[in-house]
């Protein structure tokens, strides 16, 4: 029987938020932002363990109370210089301390994506549990896309047919994901699915919800808080 594990890479600085504090610790609906993702993941009976990968020397984590998640949560201080490196380091460290098999599923989720709900999480696992490759939550692109020149003038309109906006969690088997990220080398990977694609595999796109947004800019905080309040 395959088990499910979750991993949150939380070693980033969140520079686009214009705040000195890493954005995963910014207050959202009275809690650190990362708390909301942890609550959904740790409350899922299908997930055996949830790992958070921090930067070495992270001082913010210890300032908050995570005891409500203690039965399922593990903290790893092995974050790297890039997201891919952080995920890879976390995967290796997680297996050292936990009985993770090569065919077990790992769900990698953004720390700054706080509005993931339990139903959407279950949908992802249901649709991918028997899949040969794995996949990710995503939404079809609805807006018109423009290609700009260096001066921010629109050069042309890009066709949006077949284009999807990737979200997280992204769910792949442990060994496949480790192999994909290990082979990425110096290539910049903005998500785990990109590393899987580089192996010649085709991750499945599971239709998601636009409310599963990533907090990237300061104005996103108000929208995320509104979504969280309406979901309760």
From Swiss-Prot:
It catalyses: 2-C-methyl-D-erythritol 4-phosphate + CTP + H(+) = 4-CDP-2-C-methyl-D-erythritol + diphosphate. One of its GO terms (biological process) is isopentenyl diphosphate biosynthetic process, methylerythritol 4-phosphate pathway. It holds the Pfam family IspD. The record marks 16, 23 as: Transition state stabilizer. Keywords: Isoprene biosynthesis, Nucleotidyltransferase, Transferase. Pathway: Isoprenoid biosynthesis; isopentenyl diphosphate biosynthesis via DXP pathway; isopentenyl diphosphate from 1-deoxy-D-xylulose 5-phosphate: step 2/6. Its EC number is 2.7.7.60. PROSITE patterns: ISPD. Disulfide bonds: none annotated. The record marks 160, 214 as: Positions MEP for the nucleophilic attack. One of its GO terms (molecular function) is 2-C-methyl-D-erythritol 4-phosphate cytidylyltransferase activity. PANTHER family: 2-C-METHYL-D-ERYTHRITOL 4-PHOSPHATE CYTIDYLYLTRANSFERASE, CHLOROPLASTIC. Catalyzes the formation of 4-diphosphocytidyl-2-C-methyl-D-erythritol from CTP and 2-C-methyl-D-erythritol 4-phosphate (MEP). Belongs to the IspD/TarI cytidylyltransferase family. IspD subfamily. This is 2-C-methyl-D-erythritol 4-phosphate cytidylyltransferase. It comes from Nitrosospira multiformis (strain ATCC 25196 / NCIMB 11849 / C 71). The gene is ispD.
